[in-house]
UniProtKB/Swiss-Prot annotation:
The gene is eIF3-S8. Keywords: Cytoplasm, Initiation factor, Protein biosynthesis. GO terms for cellular component: eukaryotic 43S preinitiation complex; eukaryotic 48S preinitiation complex; eukaryotic translation initiation factor 3 complex. Belongs to the eIF-3 subunit C family. Residues 860-873 have a biased composition (Low complexity). This is Eukaryotic translation initiation factor 3 subunit C.
């Protein structure tokens, strides 16, 4: 074979001549990497495999819980159920059917997570569609699956801090792995051979990069092998005769100790994290140095205590300040000042700083403070205000500078503001109430603190009145009004009924005194506006309708309220709602409807009264806006019953709308008095099958349908019954009086509706018959019909001798009215079709000369002519009607004269 086809090697090992046949060295078919030579094959049991699969799935579940990926969490839970089903034979065999503790822990954590996410309704709204759907499916599947683990979960809940099986397994694995690593690092000293393959293994252990050598093994490789063999020989002899076992045991002990230390540090870190979570994110300031108290032999006086106080308070607001430690220092400083008897001024200064430090303890202003801090805050403020009231020579004011403070001689001057502290206290109390569940005992317990808060405000009122600052007096008066205006005082009604002496003071008298002072002395519009609104609310709450109405009309608040801040607008809405209820109790149906129509027309009375947030679409309200609106919500005990408001509004609309609809049944230009009530009525009429009423709205709609036919008894039964009494009418103070007023108005409006509806049927109708039909006195029926005739609502005349109502046929009949409506609608349709046809023609640029202009002028002239004809016809109809009325009047006069002549 030629040298060209042979392709010999160019390396130094090719030293043969050209005549000799060239042998090409073949590469081995299978090469083993160094890793494959070193790694030992580990045989694991079925239990280890199954438990490892379960632990991996549990880790993924915990990761998905952190990021709230519900769809992935659902799929991982399904994987967990399948993996547990696979591991069940192993569990029954190895664990005697007892479920491992790490699985129970994972199920308990998953249950807590699902319940937490499900209870967070606001957070659920922000979930995506896929995540919310997956959350519902996960909750259903989990509740079904967890029934088999009820007993195990109960045992786990009793002692959740015990160690898991998974942790033990991991510890064993770590120990085994560490032992394997030690065995791999230190070669065994038992079987040391001097063969070539062992030498190659030692070489591989020394240098892993040498495994990538070329395939050509020649003389150089042999020489390398011989040299490495000699080195390995010496190394193996050294290792063979070296003492290892004792040292290795010592190393193992040291490593085990190190592992224990690392585990202890990890456990301590975990505990620290749990404590940090319990403290709700409080930072521990280990870096900041503790300010040292006084030396043992130091002479403690006022200046030294004040300097130390300033030193402690200098760290206020800084990043690494330990707030808890700061409060402890201040209390210790107070104890020292009391022990040394440094005076009331120093004690007041220290107590005021303690109050400020407690306020600073909560860094987030939007969140309420803890209950333990709240109780301490109440104690400190009560002690401070008692100290200020007992020592009249102490002046605590924000106008005093730090340089001008005086602690040695009276009058003592201290920089600070007691009013600001009490306002902050009141705000914190409101935040605590908002945070509690309103239907729990916790809310009742917190509400009991209002007595303490109002007592503190009353004491601060005395202190501020003693100082004589009018602006601060207005501010503290308004705080007192805020706790007083929404509370009902039964002594007001007792005093009105002369059941109490006239000299007794009631809440109305107190509100009058406080509000009059603010009206006269306040220099800001906001305080005066809030005082007027609270005054109106309190008057309306105690049925002082005329005083409340006059205040609203004189203040012109409805014109300027749009420029006020949101809390003032919320107070305005609450005031108008309560004013509407007061008007309804007094029987002023129109006024009640006008007060409530603005609230109810929007369909969002809950939001306008700050009594909760209505769920909206995702883009309508951002998270920041929702957070701000939550801060503006009113506490639950100040809420106005929304169902009561809606019922009063719908009943008022029914009493106004039904007679109006009957009077203008065929009027094409009829306007709606209440759009909301009209929609409720129309939606009920569109239903093919209407059952008995159940909700409050259905009761009002059924009553409206009965009133349209003049059936006042059915209408009254729908409005006033056992179910409606429980839901609505029993919530009023004098419920029986309200029910009597309702029955009277239903009878009167049903009579008006009956006359409007059936006036074209009767020629005359007897007044006693109407009085008997509607259970009204004859005088009331007579006055109602007279008003209708005077207001030109009913074309009729009263015949007093015969006590009859003579009805005139001046109105068109039903057929005539319908034909007139049809003619109007057909005319409008023709006009609109002509306009559409002209727009579609598009011949605007093909007219000759002034053709279009002439036609427009002709149309305008025709319209004017039609309008004049319509006016003439209307005048003629009015003249004919007047002539008919005069003729009827003359006939009645003639009949009366004839009747008198016959009687004589």
């Amino acid at each position: 074979m030629s040298r060209f086809f042979a392709g010999g090697s160019e390396s130094d090992s090719d030293s043969s001549s050209d005549s000799e046949p060239i042998q090409r060295q073949t590469a081995p078919q299978f090469t083993f990497s160094d890793e494959e030579e070193d790694v030992k094959r580990v045989v694991r049991s079925t239990k280890e495999k199954r438990y490892e699969d379960l632990s991996n799935i549990i880790k993924s579940i915990r990761n998905y819980k952190k990021i709230k990926d519900m769809s992935s969490l659902l799929s991982s839970f399904e994987d967990l159920t399948r993996a547990y089903a696979k591991a069940l034979p192993v569990i029954t065999k190895e664990e005697n059917g007892v479920c491992p503790r790490f699985i129970i822990r994972a199920l308990a954590e998953l249950e807590d997570f699902i319940n937490e996410v499900w209870d967070d309704r606001e957070g659920r709204k922000n979930l995506s569609k896929n995540n919310s759907k997956s959350l519902g499916a996960l909750r259903q599947k989990f509740r079904k699956y967890i029934k088999d683990f009820d007993s195990d979960l109960k045992k786990f809940r009793e002692s959740p801090d015990a160690a898991d099986d998974e942790d033990e397994e991991e510890e064993k694995k770590e120990e085994e792995e560490s032992d394997d690593e030690e065995a791999a690092v230190v070669p065994a000293a038992k079987a040391v051979s001097f063969k070539k393959d062992t030498v190659e293994k030692v070489k591989v252990e020394k240098d892993d990069d040498d495994s990538d050598d070329s395939i050509d093994w020649g003389q150089d490789s042999d020489s390398d092998e011989s040299s490495s063999e000699e080195e390995a020989y010496g190394a193996n002899i050294r290792e063979r005769f070296l003492k290892r076992p004792e040292k290795e045991d010592g190393d193992d002990g040291e490593k085990k100790k190190e592992k224990k230390k690392t585990k202890e540090t990890k456990d301590s870190r975990k505990k620290k994290r749990v404590e940090d979570d319990d403290d709700e994110g409080w930072e521990s300031s280990a870096t900041s140095e503790k300010p040292k108290m006084f030396a043992k032999d130091a002479e403690i006086d006022v200046a030294l205590v004040v300097n130390k106080l300033n030193e402690v308070m200098a760290a206020r607001g800084k990043k690494r300040t330990d707030r808890k430690l700061q409060i402890e220092f201040l209390r210790e400083l107070r104890a020292i000042s009391e022990e040394k008897k440094l005076g009331a001024a120093v004690a007041a200064k220290i107590r005021f700083n303690i109050v400020s430090a407690i306020f600073d303890y909560n860094p987030k202003v939007s969140e309420p403070m803890k209950l333990e801090h709240w109780s301490k805050l109440l104690e400190e403020i009560q002690a401070l205000i008692k100290l200020l009231l007992a020592n009249e020579d102490i002046v605590l004011s924000e106008n005093i500078l730090d340089e001008n403070e005086e602690y040695d001689t009276a009058p003592y001057k201290i920089r600070g503001c007691m009013l600001t502290a009490v306002e902050r206290l009141d705000d914190e109390f409101t935040k605590l109430l908002k945070e509690c569940d309103p239907h729990s005992n916790e809310y009742v317990d917190r509400l009991k603190d209002e007595v303490t808060v109002t007592n503190v405000i009353e004491q601060v009122v005395q202190y501020v009145e003693r100082l004589g600052n009018e602006m601060e007096t207005c501010r503290i008066y308004l705080r007192k009004i805020d706790h007083l205006y929404y509370k009902f005082d039964p002594n007001v009604l007792k005093k009105r009924k002369a059941q109490l002496p006239a000299s007794s003071l009631t809440s109305v008298d107190e509100m009058e005194r406080l509000c009059r002072f603010i009206y006269a002395k306040d220099q800001t519009d906001r305080l005066r506006t809030r005082a007027i609104l609270s005054h109106i609310f309190h008057h309306a709450l105690h049925d002082n309708w005329f005083q409340a109405r006059d205040l609203v009309l004189m203040s012109h608040l409805q014109e300027t309220i749009h420029h006020s801040d949101p809390p003032t607008q919320i107070l305005y809405n609450r005031t108008m709602a309560n004013l509407g209820l007061c008007a309804f109790r007094h029987g002023n149906i129109k006024d009640a409807h006008q007060c409530l129509v603005d609230l109810m027309m929007t369909g969002k009375p809950k939001e306008l009264l700050a009594q909760g947030l209505v769920p909206q679409r995702q883009n309508e309200r951002s998270l920041e806006q929702e957070k701000v609106e939550k801060q503006r919500q009113m506490p639950f005990h100040m809420h106005i019953n929304l169902e009561l408001l809606e019922c009063v509004y719908l009943v008022s609309a029914m009493l106004l709308e039904i007679p109006y609809m009957a009077a203008h049944e065929f009027d094409a230009r009829r306007r709606m008095i209440s759009k909301t009530f009209y929609q409720q009525l129309r939606s009920s009429e569109r239903q093919s099958l209407v059952g008995p009423p159940e909700s409050m709205r259905e009761h009002v709609v059924a009553a409206a349908k009965a009133m349209r036919h003049g059936d006042w008894q059915a209408c009254s039964n729908f409005i006033v019954n056992k179910k409606m009494n429980v839901k609505v009418w029993d919530l009023f103070y004098e419920a029986d009086r309200v029910r009597e007023m309702l029955a009277k108005f239903i009878k009167e409006e049903a009579l008006r509706t009956y006359l409007f509806t059936y006036s074209n049927v009767y020629a005359s109708i007897s007044v006693p018959y109407l009085a008997e039909m509607f259970d009204l006195p004859k005088s009331k029926v007579h006055s109602l019909i007279s008003k209708m005739i005077i207001n030109e609502e009913l074309m009729a005349s009263l015949d007093d001798p015969t006590e009859t109502v003579v009805l005139h046929r001046s109105e068109p009949s039903r057929l005539q009215a319908l034909s007139m409506q049809l003619a109007d609608k057909v005319t409008n349709l023709v006009d609109s079709n002509e306009r559409v046809f002209e727009m579609k023609q598009g011949n605007f640029f093909q007219r000759g000369g002034n053709q279009g202009y002439n036609r427009d002028r002709q149309n305008y002239r025709n319209q004017n002519q039609n309008r004049e004809n319509w006016n003439n016809n209307r005048r003629q109809d009015r003249g004919n009607r007047n002539r008919n009325q005069n003729r009827d009047r003359e006939q009645r006069e003639q009949h009366r004269v004839e009747f008198e002549e016959k009687a004589e």
